[in-house]
């Protein structure tokens, strides 16, 4: 049974308390580094709210942290992403659109990399 809950309940029971069988939530990882996103799946990471536990993944993460070569670190990150995909750590249902089209006579628009847009500063040029 899917039980809708408010954001505070979700944060306390799921994110902090880890009291769930499955959860559906919106996550936006556009503004964090690859390392910050991938470290969320390390077994003992406090932000690992999906309770992913994989010693092989943890070893790859430690290896990536120890890398001094960008190309080598990128290759390890790719291995980690492959492992997350193959073990179904998460199931992504949507990829937020990040395209915006505006008329040439509109001014003041600022693009935000999230679904909400502030149109209070938009106006017509004269």
PLM regions: where:
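Extracytoplasmic/secreted proteins, especially bacterial periplasmic and envelope-associated proteins
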Residues: 9, 13, 33-36, 56-63, ...
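Short, solvent-exposed coil/turn elements at secondary-structure transition points
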Residues: 6-8, 28, 70, 99, ...
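Short, solvent-exposed loop/beta-turn-alpha elements that line the ligand-binding surface or hinge
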Residues: 14-19, 39-66, 95-126
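Bilobed periplasmic-binding protein-like "clamshell/Venus-flytrap" ligand-binding domains
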Residues: 22-26, 68-104
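Periplasmic binding protein-like
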Residues: 1-42, 76
């Amino acid at each position: 049974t899917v039980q809708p809950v408010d954001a505070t309940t979700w944060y306390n029971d799921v994110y902090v308390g880890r009291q769930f069988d499955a959860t559906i939530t919106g996550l936006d990882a556009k503004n964090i580094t690859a390392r910050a996103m991938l470290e969320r799946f390390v077994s003992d990471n406090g932000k690992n709210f999906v309770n992913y536990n994989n010693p092989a993944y943890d070893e790859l993460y430690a290896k990536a942290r120890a890398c001094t070569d960008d190309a080598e670190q990128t290759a390890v990150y790719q291995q980690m992403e492959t492992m997350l995909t193959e073990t179904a750590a998460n199931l992504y249902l949507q990829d937020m659109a990040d395209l915006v089209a505006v008329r040439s006579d509109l001014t003041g628009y600022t693009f935000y990399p999230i679904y909400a847009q502030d149109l209070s500063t938009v106006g017509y040029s004269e």
